[in-house]
Amino acid sequence: MEVLREKVEEEEEAEREEAAERAEWARMEKMMRPVEVRKEENTLKQETLRDLEKKLSEIQITVSAELPAFTKDTIDISKLPVSYKTNTPKEEHLLQVADNFSCQYSHLCPDRVPLFLHPLNECEVPKFVSTTLRPTLMPYPELYNWDSCAQFVSDFLTMVPLPDPLKPPSHLYSSTTVLKYQKGNCFDFSTLLCSMLIGSGYDAYCVNGYGSLDLCHMDLTREVCPLTVKPKETIKKEEKVLPKKYTIKPPRDLCSRFEQEQEVKKQQEIRAQEKKRLREEEERLMEAEKAKPDALHGLRVHSWVLVLSGKREVPENFFIDPFTGHSYSTQDEHFLGIESLWNHKNYWINMQDCWNCCKDLIFDLGDPVRWEYMLLGTDKSQLSLTEEDDSGINDEDDVENLGKEDEDKSFDMPHSWVEQIEISPEAFETRCPNGKKVIQYKRAKLEKWAPYLNSNGLVSRLTTYEDLQCTNILEIKEWYQNREDMLELKHINKTTDLKTDYFKPGHPQALRVHSYKSMQPEMDRVIEFYETARVDGLMKREETPRTMTEYYQGRPDFLSYRHASFGPRVKKLTLSSAESNPRPIVKITERFFRNPAKPAEEDVAERVFLVAEERIQLRYHCREDHITASKREFLRRTEVDSKGNKIIMTPDMCISFEVEPMEHTKKLLYQYEAMMHLKREEKLSRHQVWESELEVLEILKLREEEEAAHTLTISIYDTKRNEKSKEYREAMERMMHEEHLRQVETQLDYLAPFLAQLPPGEKLTRWQAVRLKDECLSDFKQRLINKANLIQARFEKETQELQKKQQWYQENQVTLTPEDEDLYLSYCSQAMFRIRILEQRLNRHKELAPLKYLALEEKLYKDPRLGELQKIFA
């Protein structure tokens, strides 16, 4: 390194000397030129300067919107506790140990960067990084697992880049300050997340290392959004069906084998060209998506969290990026190296080579060869000594001395100087800063909102794009919470214009999924229901302009399928709706599950009502030991015979095929009863189809009303948002206050001021009792009069001010602006309200004053201290 530095300095010195010589030759040549040439050059230079000034004046500088700065100057440290502003003796000792450790490390590893040991906190006090961690278990069950903790930290805080991307920060703030201002760099993110994970029981560590450009800048534009990744579909292996011995042989293939081979070759060429085109297109897209080379690759400082296996049933080690909350394998290429890591008990330096990023690192912190620790007494067990190393420790005295030496060198980590980390329920519910956060992914944009921030209950929206520039929208997914209509997800496909609504259980119509392109009736739509919440067991209803298909489950009549075909609607002269003028039914097909209580030859599997053709077709279930099923068809005839009588039933009106014919099925009476039963069933089926059409209309009308209202539900335990609970609580508080005033009034002693004028303990005479009574009543009467006069004075004052304002308005009415008129009208309205209230108070006071006077007089007569009055009126 020293040789390379000297070589670079020599080259720079040679370049400076060469530049000085060129400047000297140019000056000499200029002096030797004629005066005219020099004048022309000066003129040209002036014109060039004027042209340059003109062009520069046309340039407008636009200040780019930078990320909000988060520095110590923006933090209010006046209310911080003493532990933030000073160090305890134990912390000072720890800082000395850390400085000594850093000096030894710099001496032994001069090529390594300085250690990140004790940065300054928000009060400019150096604090050891391990004491900045405050293990805390949050009181929210959602924050008990690592994934929810990481997602909360990612959503709650706003990322601020490091001041110098090549160095760790000079300040490391406490987690309480970071939570208060909701901003921080990667080290602040990691400190907060690691504190929460350790409190939840994970073996977590803060890492000081190097990351990729995307990782350090929280750039997810080359990452696929996790919400767009579809789960892998399990491919079921098709079981090979063994050919039966007596199967029918297929007919002989008479097609030309040569033509088939040529067609196969042609198809293979087409597929090869298509595959080549797709490969070229994929390479082009990969080239476009490829990140530009980073000049600082491998040098950018980043901090993240390492979670080791063992605790909380973690099967293997993994990294957590605190910016995004995503987990990564320790082999991931985004993490380029590790300098050191720490938890709340110790500090470790990585002594392994990171030439292959973090792929070859072994995270055995008990191995002092790979991980150099700072403090003894760590909870990580040391490697066991081999037999060769153990041979030198044979004597008991040596073992005792070794134990004493370790005991003397051990040093316990001081307690954290950070206050208890607390997250209020309001902050936990709001999550994102100001309640909103936007994350840009590769071909996708994710927006998040706090619950109840949007009036329609929208909490998240995922927009998927077709191109990398995010201009052509493919689909939109919107997630909702606390909706009264139980709407949970809305999926909009911009390519097909198909909208799909997903509902949670509890909708009035038991909706589960509603797919549609238009809310107009008799259009293509699919409605799925929670069949257990419906009486009829309807699972799904598919509708087109000419058909309606319904699927059932769990019905007592074993109905599983109903398909209705409609004909063109008959035009009417008057205006008609779908309800008053239903579509004519052409055909109804119904299918049934097997009813084990009936024999197969009597259990109908499918029945078809051909309404227009006046035919009914039946197909029965097939017995297990048969390969064919019985069938029957009924013809409804409206003709009359030769005598003019209506034909009820003839043998040709029932065409049947029976696997095992029976005598009673051939009788006309049996066939007649079966046809009459089917006619009733047809009428019932047509009515049910009509009811289904009406139900669709009701659902569409209800959905339009719900979308227009988008009412949100509020829990009865949410006292801040629940208006009914709030009104009830305020009413109870008002009643308690009034009751308190009544108690104070009843306990008020009216005679106390007058009795104080007499000698204590002296018994009142008759004359003194009468005088006290008269004085008390006179004083009370005067107070009632004063109160009436006060109300009257306020009333007159308000009236005079209103009259003056009205007079001013009459004088300046022409020159007033609309804003002045609005202010005048508002003042008049408020003044009239005050005048009316004062008038009501005065009238009420006039009505109640005599009653209060009489009540006090009666109370004085009954007062035991004025017993002489009772003798007078006895």
Curated annotation (Swiss-Prot):
Tissue: Expressed in the testis.
Predominant cellular place of this UniProt entry's protein: other
GO CC term, one of those recorded: cytoplasm
Acidic residues bias: start-end ranges: 386-400
Coiled-coil residues: 1-67, 257-297
GO terms under biological process: flagellated sperm motility; sperm axoneme assembly; spermatogenesis
Taxonomic superkingdom: Eukaryota
UniProt entry keywords in alphabetical sequence: Cell projection, Cilium, Coiled coil, Cytoplasm, Cytoskeleton, Differentiation, Flagellum, Spermatogenesis
InterPro entries: CEPT76/DRC7_peptidase-like_dom, DRC7/lobo, DRC7_C, MORN_DRC7, Papain-like_cys_pep_sf
Subcellular location: Cell projection, Cilium, Flagellum; Cytoplasm, Cytoskeleton, Cilium axoneme; Cytoplasm, Cytoskeleton, Flagellum axoneme
Residue ranges with Basic and acidic residues bias: 401-410
Disordered as annotated region, ranges: 1-20, 386-410
Family matches, as SUPFAM superfamilies: Cysteine proteinases
Primary role: Component of the nexin-dynein regulatory complex (N-DRC) a key regulator of ciliary/flagellar motility which maintains the alignment and integrity of the distal axoneme and regulates microtubule sliding in motile axonemes. Involved in the regulation of flagellar motility. Essential for male fertility, sperm head morphogenesis and sperm flagellum formation.
PANTHER family to which the protein is assigned, alphabetical: DYNEIN REGULATORY COMPLEX SUBUNIT 7
Family recorded in the similarity comment: Belongs to the DRC7 family.
Subunit structure comment from the entry: Component of the nexin-dynein regulatory complex (N-DRC). Interacts with TCTE1/DRC5. Interacts with DRC3 and GAS8/DRC4.
Protein name: Dynein regulatory complex subunit 7
